[in-house]
């Protein structure tokens, strides 16, 4: 096992990374190795998928499988080794089906079919020991002694960014939104990685290409969310419980939540959101369900405490799951790409078992005094009052904007984001997105001339909204985004955040502060390139960084 894809990776050894029997995320070495092998297998599908496109052949089910398989390998998504064995078998069958279609097309047209090598020629071993032996040769650090840490780190940057792209594309796909150019870009990147690239410039350009592709994917997901559920609207969300039977929904998948709301209508069961599901309350088609009563708990890393105290069943719809404690192991369910050994997995939006569990559990005995927070400041809401915002800037009422967002986590140093937000002067506006918001979203920030000082833009994928807001302001002031009174203070944890970071870099956005630590796969040599080209810098002291951001604007 070797893995350093997330922020919580082990950094105590000579080389950062989890390389023991169990990673810091809870992933055991068998699962980690099978995930490495699944990525290898998916590269083989992509090699034939890319070839098939040149021959006019399409296999949409193969495209979709690539998204799903990649999603299962993200941090805190799937820990179920047996499911990865099954996915490996399915990957080989999928690859062979695409290859057979290429063969048939070549015969029909008289074209010569090239003999693809590497992952395209891989065949799964017959048993688990054999699969693990195969995995040992294809891990993320394969070739380290030959090509060096910089090349391995750049390959990891591309792969991890690609995982985030696939996750966002999967979210859009399950809502009925997909595009062939997105599948083509994803499979081209996987096929590129299948060649074991060693050219620094080619790797950096591929990373930026993925950033551009991810912008397209986030735009598609934005269209999917708004197309299915309406544009986000500023909405008050209850954060105190209501008496009655209850189900808690965590993760990111709005489609799963909608299906559950439909199935629980009229049952007397109240539904609560958790973690990154909080923005669901801002979508009209979801907020219209009266039994979507509120949000419970905090960010993903608080789930063991939150879930233990919740008096009903829990549904995990996507990342991020942590090892379930005995207090709730029998009442947590997974769906979609999520998995944990011994936890019941629900398929095809059939939540009848979950609903029966809710009816059998006590629920909340009493209604607590009402407490609310406000969400729903996506691009439609903010750009709808753009004139008011622009006038406030011109009048000197708004001096600066801060985007303080991204993934939260349990590592020391994340209080920085709370301190930064709390210390932001009263004439500044804080935009936030992702679960990092839980560090300060219950604080009273007030408003500036009726404009809330804290604007919750949405989930991590709503970085697209934040980008649209920033570019609209730049257009209004006839300047570039880097010339705006805007600072990006980003908290990263996993591969979706890596994809968003690549998008920001591809857009030429500079001087991003990133923390709480820099990615372990970003070697000093690669970091020098990112600093030189993009001005990326690690977070430091909140007060000093805040002063530097404001002084940069003044200068």
UniProtKB/Swiss-Prot annotation:
Cysteine persulfide, modified sites: 407
Cofactors that this protein relies on: [4Fe-4S] cluster; hybrid [4Fe-2O-2S] cluster
Domain of life: Bacteria
GO molecular function terms noted in the UniProt entry: 4 iron, 4 sulfur cluster binding; hydroxylamine reductase activity; metal ion binding; peroxidase activity
Protein residues bound to hybrid [4Fe-2O-2S] cluster: 252, 276, 320, 407, 435, 460, 494, 496
Class of the enzyme per the UniProt entry, highest EC level: oxidoreductase
Keywords for this protein: 4Fe-4S, Cytoplasm, Iron, Iron-sulfur, Metal-binding, Oxidoreductase
Signal sequence interval, chain numbering: none
One Gene Ontology CC term in the entry: cytoplasm
Note accompanying the cofactor annotation: Binds 1 [4Fe-4S] cluster. Binds 1 hybrid [4Fe-2O-2S] cluster.
Binding site for [4Fe-4S] cluster: 3, 6, 18, 25
GO term, biological process aspect, one: response to hydrogen peroxide
InterPro entries to which the protein is assigned, alphabetical: HCP/CODH, Hydroxylam_reduct, Prismane-like_a/b-sand, Prismane-like_sf, Prismane_a-bundle
Catalysed reactions, as listed in the record: A + NH4(+) + H2O = hydroxylamine + AH2 + H(+)
EC number: 1.7.99.1
Subcellular location: Cytoplasm
Keyword ATP-binding found: no
Role played: Catalyzes the reduction of hydroxylamine to form NH(3) and H(2)O.
Family that this chain belongs to: Belongs to the HCP family.
Name of this chain's protein: Hydroxylamine reductase
